[in-house]
């Protein structure tokens, strides 16, 4: 493990993936890290599927995806991994839904999405898969909400989101799915909405205070954080084009309001397109793009108790556009872009947890 500042944290470096990729789909199942599809050096979606055995630290090639795709969503359902949507080799959104059967090492096709979509957000609850939003073949953002019933192998429609979007951040908290941000074409969305799984109704919460693309979002201790990103030009700032910011905005779920933290509590680095998550009592920001000519390797954490940012151990491999996944005490940064698509697989860990 690499060590440095932030004594509670360290990096665990795993063997590189056999295939370099960006926009890969990742899942963690029974001690195995699965990396599916994505884009390789040629810039085209892959059908390659690989898994890392966390015990032996060895990679194994899996049966290829029936549909080559990048930017798909994945949900673990027991011994299966369901892959939903994405973009295909023709740069068109995908309707295909496929399941990898881990015990049998093979893929099965499942009921397709009612409408092809990329940038779908997925959430699993009680064995059901909820797919929210996306962008269709006509490039219009979608408001559809669908739920997949594995036993019947079918998708059912639920009340649509108030705000169509794709690429949104989603969080499951209690009996509600929270949907934050996303995009409509090139424009970032500021909407923050919640779907009640029992009442099957939507609630609009106050919108994000600022409009930013490629921000990082996380939930920790009853609050939702929106960090950094590319600030969009607007009537209330003097920038004529998007610029990197270190903004920190926090929504208190109990009180139902946003707080834009003061300058003294902003992130140490301005960044966008980075990995974000919650480890222990810290909200963590990893890598990304900033004002430098190459991806950032810096890492920082916001201590929820001390309410301040501190430097954490830097990434062993500086990258942006990583696929990320949180599994127990590890926050993975997988693939992404260094000087091109990367093979790196690294995890920021809580020292006491590994």
From Swiss-Prot:
Q: Which stretches are Kelch repeats?
A: 1-31, 32-79, 81-127, 128-175, 176-222, 224-281, 282-329, 331-354
Which GO biological process categories is it annotated with?
mitotic cytokinetic process; mitotic nuclear division; nuclear chromosome segregation
> Localized where?
Cytoplasm; Midbody
Ordered alphabetically, the record's keywords are: Cell cycle, Cell division, Cytoplasm, Kelch repeat, Repeat
SMART domains documented for this protein? Kelch (SM00612)
Q: Which domain of life is it from?
A: Eukaryota
GO cellular component terms given for this protein: cellularization cleavage furrow; cytoplasm; intercellular bridge; midbody
Per the entry, what this protein does is:
Involved in pinching off the separated nuclei at the cleavage furrow and in cytokinesis. Required for mitotic integrity and maintenance of chromosomal stability. Protects cells against mitotic errors, centrosomal amplification, micronucleus formation and aneuploidy. Plays a key role of midbody function involving abscission of the daughter cells during cytokinesis and appropriate chromosomal and nuclear segregation into the daughter cells.
Read off the PANTHER family from this record: KELCH DOMAIN-CONTAINING PROTEIN 8B, RING-TYPE DOMAIN-CONTAINING PROTEIN
> Under what name is this protein listed?
Kelch domain-containing protein 8B
Question: Which species does this protein come from?
Answer: Bos taurus
